[in-house]
From Swiss-Prot:
GO molecular function: glutamate-5-semialdehyde dehydrogenase activity; NADP binding
One annotated GO biological process: L-proline biosynthetic process
GO cellular component: cytoplasm
Cited CDD domains: ALDH_F18-19_ProA-GPR (cd07079)
Name of the protein: Gamma-glutamyl phosphate reductase
């Protein structure tokens, strides 16, 4: 990679701004976040005009409704972005937090302390609200960010970033930057090891896989959400249906929506029809195996690869399983490691499921929609990690830090 590339220049400027950010007090960072929120409110007309151009272009290009919904900004959504920045300002600052501390036999005090990561690159698809969320979390945790949005949201991202940057002092303005250009620019960002400390991709499987396989910079993988709900033999059917409806239909285009329901054969006769009733009333098409179709002919046949789909739409896969072990095996084969749910009255089933399923979040008798930084009390999240290092699950402020060891003595030398 050429040392004179635009991405390298941006990363160097971001590093300089991050150095200033590291020294800011919490009150200073909180004031900046509030100012960025004001910038969004002041710039609402410009942001809406830019977003309208992006949406029109996307619609003309045949963008599907799920992506158009993610792309679209409204006055209410922009206000939500501003409120989100203010919410981050009210969160505890993890920087400087002592994780643990002890004294050596010679009296040296050792503390493990949270510090910013540095320069974080975020590559994401058609969601302009991610722009403000990412900038807010990075700034509060003392990091600079290089934001690589999709071309479909270019005008929106330009307007959002311009509105926020207009309220930042010059010495840290480059802590929030938009990375523009073609695919070669994305490749430069992914290979800018030594200039960019961390990459976080947010989007569909294609984007995430491309970043994970092509990056030389360390990556936190925010996986796709092929999430399951298991209705165990002891489940309260009404509870299970209510949870399934919420998890599927509240926002079908997000990663914590369920895509598949697995029903224990012992309860299928009483659970399948109420489930299909509730889903049909809300416009959901249920795709199932032969056994489920025999129980309710409204179910359409599932294609061979149906259970690997992250629909992000009003579609739901359904399968009858012999027992909980088969459900867990199905999840291991088809799941994405995001969020997995069981509805059951059995404590042993709860414990077996929680200890057997390999996922960032396991839910018992509650909706997968709770797997969210806001619901966890983290404030705005940078994404939901489905890997095991360096973070797993919703990533808030603490997940945007690393640690350093600070040793204090009074002249000790090692014997």
């Amino acid at each position: 990679m050429a040392m004179s590339s635009r991405v390298i220049e941006q990363a160097i400027a971001a590093r300089s701004a991050a150095t200033v950010l590291r020294r800011l007090r919490r009150i200073d960072k909180d004031d900046l976040l509030a100012a960025m929120g004001i910038g969004l409110r002041k710039g609402v007309d410009e942001i809406l005009a830019a977003n309208g151009a992006d949406v029109d272009r996307g619609r003309d290009a045949g963008m599907d409704e799920a992506l158009l919904d993610r792309l679209t900004l409204t006055p209410e959504r922009i206000e939500g972005m501003a409120v989100g920045l203010e919410g981050v300002a009210h969160l505890d600052d993890p920087v400087g937090e002592v994780v643990r501390g002890w004294h050596t036999p010679l009296g040296v005090k050792i503390e493990q302390v949270r510090v910013p990561i540095g320069v974080i690159g975020i590559i994401y698809e058609a969601r302009p609200n991610v722009t403000s969320d990412a900038a807010g979390i990075c700034l509060k945790s003392g990091n600079a960010c290089l934001l690589r949005g999709s071309s479909s949201a270019l005008e929106s991202n330009r307007a959002v970033i311009a509105a926020m940057r207009s309220r930042l002092p010059e010495e840290i303005r480059e802590a929030v930057q938009l990375v523009e250009g073609g695919h070669e620019v994305t490749d430069e960002l992914m290979t800018a090891r030594g200039y960019v400390d961390l990459l976080i991709p947010r989007g569909g499987a294609g984007l995430i896989n491309a970043v994970v396989t092509g990056a030389k910079v360390p990556v936190i993988q925010t996986g796709t959400g092929n999430c399951h709900l298991v209705i165990d033999v002891s489940a309260d059917v009404e509870m299970a249906v209510n949870i399934a409806v919420n998890a599927k239909t509240q926002r079908p285009s997000v990663c914590n929506a369920i895509e598949t329901v697995l029903v224990h054969r012992g309860i299928a006769d009483s659970a399948v029809r109420p489930l299909v009733d509730a889903m049909s009333e809300r416009g959901v098409t249920v795709h199932g195996d032969e056994e489920s179709i025999r129980l309710d002919p409204r179910i359409v046949p599932a294609a061979p690869d149906e259970y690997d789909n992250e629909y992000l739409s009003l579609d739901l896969a359904l399968r009858i399983v012999d027992d909980l072990e088969e459900a867990v095996d199905h999840i291991a084969k088809h799941g994405s490691g995001h969020s997995e749910t069981i509805v059951t009255k059995s404590m042993s089933s709860q414990e077996f499921f929680a200890s057997s399923v390999d996922a960032a979040a396991v839910l018992v008798n509650c909706s997968s929609r709770f797997v969210d930084g806001g619901e966890f009390g983290f404030g705005a999240e940078i994404g939901i990690s489905t890997q095991k290092l360096h973070a797993r699950g919703p990533m808030g402020l603490r997940e945007m830090t690393t640690t350093t060891y600070v040793l204090r003595g009074d002249g000790q030398t090692r014997p």
